[in-house]
Amino acid sequence: MISLLHVSLLAMLQLSDTARVFPPMQGQNLEGRTLEMPRDFAGALNVVFIAFKREQQADVDSWGAALDSLRKRHAELQVYELPTLGRRYRLIRPMIDGGMRRGIPDPTVRAATITLYIDKGPFKRALGITTEDRIEVLVVDPRGNIRWQRSGPMTPSLRAELEAAIGR
């Protein structure tokens, strides 16, 4: 019988065996600046959250304490949120982005929130995302190499994995 630990180890090995690169992408942050990703990711390591639904914000927020702790130890760590919507929503982009902007009082968080209005299929395939029902959490280096990738809200085991990926 295969244990949960074995399944987790196999998943980690599969990711390292099929190393992924963050696909070139353009988006605009909630401060109105256009960014080219991964080129404009500013950290030596970047934690990137990809969310597909409004209600997934709670899952993104669940990582907050872990990230606060990591940023105290790693000043070069940057965090980005990428709300990811289909192209058809571009027509109402001002309304969507304006609503998010009003809901985020911190200009630093707004600058790191980059809404994508894209053809989601190729983006998800490039990242190996099979469902929009969970958030994706990635650690991306300055070259766009994905060092770590998992799905869902923070758990103690995922926190330990993230800390190991970043280097305690």
Model-flagged regions — what are they?
Residues 124-125, 132-168:
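Thiol-/selenol-based redox modules, centered on thioredoxin-like
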Residues 54-56, 85-89, 121-123, 145-146, ...:
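Solvent-exposed loop/turn segments at secondary-structure junctions
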Residues 88-133:
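Thioredoxin-like thiol-disulfide oxidoreductase module
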Residues 3-14:
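Hydrophobic alpha-helical targeting segments used for export or membrane insertion
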Residues 55-106:
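Structural microenvironment flanking redox-active thiols in thiol-disulfide oxidoreductases
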